[in-house]
Curated annotation (Swiss-Prot):
The keyword ATP-binding applies. One of its GO terms (molecular function) is ATP binding. Catalyzes the synthesis of GMP from XMP. It catalyses: XMP + L-glutamine + ATP + H2O = GMP + L-glutamate + AMP + diphosphate + 2 H(+). This is GMP synthase [glutamine-hydrolyzing] subunit B. The gene is guaAB. Pfam families: GMP_synt_C, NAD_synthase. Heterodimer composed of a glutamine amidotransferase subunit (A) and a GMP-binding subunit (B). Residues 2-184 form the GMPS ATP-PPase domain. SUPFAM superfamilies: Adenine nucleotide alpha hydrolases-like, GMP synthetase C-terminal dimerisation domain. Keywords: ATP-binding, GMP biosynthesis, Ligase, Nucleotide-binding, Purine biosynthesis.
């Protein structure tokens, strides 16, 4: 159990000591991890912090507008890098290579922004499960195992690296962050790219973005899952009228968890599953089938890639 006040005081000191007089860039995604990092760093170094939101083109529906609004007073730099990420992911089908390509692109963008702002340090919202999965070979996280070795920063500051997700939420409460941030559902750093099996294209991302929005609309308020989402897992055969067609298969996943290290599928009512399937196939052209994933973690991970 983390002593919240003690942790906040210690993290503020560590950030201040690590940064010294240097400017620090950080990735602010709007999730609880990066938001807590931003709040701690603001206390520690004030205007030395340069928060950056990277629009990768792999974000949830309406995410960039939400971030602009939520952090309107934070002197946030917004970088439109969608074309860069799709170019970096072209032709890649292996999940591990995807994560590494995304991690490398993030670092190159932060290095570029650091040069523009005079920053020499990088602050990240890495948490303990990220380290466990990367170091254990389960999957590389874009901010740990997916990072390139040849970074140009003097150092990387990771004040949350020993905390689990539920502990980060407690720290968010201790910092007085809004409930919207404190209890926000986890979203992977690589974005929707890890919810597309196979090569990532703009067409596939557009489909999975709409499917994710429908899943969240159907489940978040009523069932309060730890995480829920849709993934594009392949092509299958369907029928429209009397005509056979090949369309996309969308898998829906909704789990309960405490810290993300283990998770159990939510046993959703059939009516809810049917409503989601009907909406996804009716509202998104090209989707022929919807399935619901009931695999716990372990043996599966929560995300598909």
């Amino acid at each position: 159990m983390v002593n919240i006040e003690k942790f906040i005081d210690q993290a503020v000191r560590e950030i201040r000591d690590a940064a010294g007089e240097d400017k620090v860039v950080m990735a602010l995604s709007g999730g609880v991890d990066s938001s807590v990092c931003a709040a701690l760093a603001t206390r520690a170094i004030g205007d030395q912090l340069v928060p950056i939101y990277v629009d990768t083109g792999l974000m949830r529906k309406g995410e960039t507008d939400r971030i602009r609004s939520l952090f309107a007073d934070a002197n946030l730099r917004v970088v439109d890098a969608a074309d860069e990420f799709f170019e970096a992911l072209a032709g890649i089908v292996d999940p591990e290579e995807k994560r590494k390509a995304i991690g490398a692109k993030f670092i190159r963008i932060f290095e570029r922004e650091a040069k523009r702002t005079g920053a020499t340090m990088l602050l990240q919202g890495t948490i303990y499960p990220d380290r466990i999965e990367s170091e254990g070979g389960i999957k590389s996280h874009h901010n740990v195992g997916g990072m390139p070795l040849d970074i140009e920063f003097k150092g990387v500051i990771e004040p949350l690296a020993d905390l689990y997700k539920d502990e980060v939420r407690e720290v968010a409460g201790g910092l007085g962050l809004p409930a919207e941030i404190q209890h926000r559902m986890p979203f992977p750093g690589p974005g929707l790219a890890v919810r597309v099996l196979g090569e990532v294209t703009k067409e596939k991302i557009a489909i999975v973005r709409e499917a994710n929005a429908i899943v969240e609309e159907c489940l978040v308020e009523e069932f309060r899952p730890w995480q829920c989402f849709a993934a594009l897992i392949g092509l299958g055969t369907g029928v429209k009228g009397d005509v056979r067609l090949h369309g996309w298969i969308v898998a829906v996943r909704a789990v309960g968890s405490r810290d993300g290290m283990t998770a159990d599928p939510l046993l959703l009512p059939y009516e809810t599953l049917s409503r989601m399937a009907t909406r996804i196939t009716a509202e998104i052209p090209g989707v022929a089938r919807v399935v619901y994933d009931v695999t716990p973690k372990p043996p599966a991970t929560i995300e598909y890639e």
